[in-house]
């Protein structure tokens, strides 16, 4: 992948990688939350958005080129990161665009401090019914299994192999080619 963020925010739990382009009203782009997610997901749209805005594209803690500390990652951790990033790096009321699972903690960040978030745009957010489910015995057992050092590391290595990420990038390219014109135009019109 040819995406190399060039700026870092020294956050309390590690260095957070991000890019900054353009001038104008600030927009923060937040990627989905999967093992292979990063700000690279936005690389095709940042230039267009940067024509009239200051565009910040972040690699969340544990993703992309940001630090990956051996900690328990929670939604509240990301809520704190988003709030701190907007306050300490952007320093102005910001439009936040989020995809997938990251949408839920962007909403929580806004609820936590609505004075720093101007608008929220969610792309393919998680179903609210899934997000509000309480863990049961089976899900707790699966979580323990995934968090075990041997099996968890094994799964992480499988999901982050270069050929797996390249395969996903190719799938994304096919999907993007099909929908990108409509998607880009709608995002640019909103902003």
State the predicted function of each range.
Residues 14, 19-65:
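Conserved HGGG/HGGXW glycine-rich cap/lid loop of the alpha/beta-hydrolase fold
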Residues 131-133, 153-191:
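Conserved alpha/beta-hydrolase catalytic His-Asp/Glu region
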Residues 96-99, 123:
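Short beta-strand immediately N-terminal to the catalytic nucleophile in serine-hydrolase-like folds
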Residues 107, 111-112, 117-151:
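Flexible "cap/lid" loop of the alpha/beta hydrolase fold
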Residues 98-106:
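Gly/Ala-rich beta-loop-alpha elbow adjacent to hydrolase catalytic centers
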């Amino acid at each position: 992948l040819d995406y190399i963020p060039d700026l870092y925010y020294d956050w309390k739990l590690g260095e957070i990688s991000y890019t900054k382009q353009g001038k104008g009203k600030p927009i923060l782009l937040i990627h989905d939350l999967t093992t292979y997610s990063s700000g690279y997901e936005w690389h095709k749209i940042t230039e267009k958005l940067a024509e009239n805005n200051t565009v910040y594209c972040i690699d969340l803690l544990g993703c992309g080129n940001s630090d990956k500390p051996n900690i328990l990652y929670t939604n509240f951790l990301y809520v704190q990161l988003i709030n701190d990033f907007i306050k300490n790096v952007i320093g102005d009321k910001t439009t936040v665009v989020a995809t997938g699972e990251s949408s839920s903690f962007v909403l929580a960040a806004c609820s936590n401090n609505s004075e720093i978030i101007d608008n929220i745009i969610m792309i393919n957010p998680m179903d609210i019914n899934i997000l509000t489910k309480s863990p049961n015995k089976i899900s707790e057992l699966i979580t323990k299994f995934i968090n075990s050092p041997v099996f968890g590391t094994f799964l992480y290595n499988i999901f982050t192999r270069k050929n797996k990420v390249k395969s996903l990038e190719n799938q994304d390219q096919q999907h993007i080619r099909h929908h990108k014109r409509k998607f880009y135009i709608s995002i640019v019109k909103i902003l």
